[in-house]
């Protein structure tokens, strides 16, 4: 198997969203996660941008297909169509902007109404590097997350702090739900697909049983 083919082998594929008001650094978070560097010439997203990356979560290889949605109101009707079947989401606000924090409830309502039934959401307070200009306290956001059953991290797309951890935590919780039976990857609209590696494991018991069936003389 070629190195390229090996690098594309994964156990699961998860559809992710990055949502929140314009100017919160959503595209910069995605760029930092994919490229491991800060995107310093970022303009507001027009419609939807896309990125993907394979990560190792507890020994499972998970490919994240990530849709970065525009935060401006005029694009909401377009971006809502991408919510369908999302398994996970980063709900992003800017810790230096009270306005972006106050808009979280609307974004959360859209995600839970339009995405998959069991969508896993992590709240990300971005621009942690601008702590001196903070308008939203860690405690206040932590309470919001607890009240709405969200995970929560403060992140910095500039320094990279907690950026990968946000995606990994969200993916880990989805994996836990699959293992517990709460999520079924084969259910339409789950936002989850089996990768080649997982499909091989699912099929291997059937192959192992085949010789026994042939040996039967009845």
UniProtKB/Swiss-Prot annotation:
The modification 5-glutamyl serotonin is found at residue 72. GO terms for cellular component: cytoplasmic vesicle membrane; early endosome membrane; extracellular exosome; glutamatergic synapse; insulin-responsive compartment; perinuclear region of cytoplasm; recycling endosome; recycling endosome membrane. GO terms for biological process: antigen processing and presentation; neurotransmitter receptor transport postsynaptic membrane to endosome; protein transport; Rab protein signal transduction; regulation of endocytosis; vesicle-mediated transport; vesicle-mediated transport in synapse. It is a peripheral membrane protein. Coiled coil: none annotated. It is an enzyme of class 3 (hydrolase). Its EC number is 3.6.5.2. The modification Phosphoserine is found at residues 190, 204. This is Ras-related protein Rab-4A. The lineage of its organism: Eukaryota, Metazoa, Chordata, Craniata, Vertebrata.
